[in-house]
Amino acid sequence: MTPAIISAFASHKFLHNLSEPLRMLLAAGVQPFQIKAGEYIGREGEVANGFFLVQSGRVSITANTPNRGEVEIQQLGAGEAVGWSWLVPPHKWEFNARAIDDVAGLRFDADWLRNTCEQNHALGYQFLKQLVQTLAERLKATRHQLSQTQD
């Protein structure tokens, strides 16, 4: 792993509450990723085979609706995590994640991450705490967005 990846990994907002030993354990499974504007990181219903930490660019999280088509729920940027469906069976994307800009970041293989969290309960617990915190923040943001929507 390059020094740039180690530095980016250690400074990412999603991982800042993890202890150094747990971050280093996770670092063994991280790979850089890049995606062009307009491309999808994942699509609703597809196999969720990765977990992504955004370092630059913006990602639109959308849902497919019967009456309105693809509707944006929120936008995520640097310091945010994308993709939690890898954790929950049947391991399929629940939402779409599309790059608004060119996006760069770090990616974990879903199988590797599930296995690593199962083998190291301390890591699994800390990772889940951070993931639940992230989901709670997103739910609050979605609630706020819905309260601002006028039909």
Predicted features along the sequence, with ranges:
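Cytosolic regulatory regions built on CNB/CRP/Popeye-like sensor folds
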Residues: 1-151
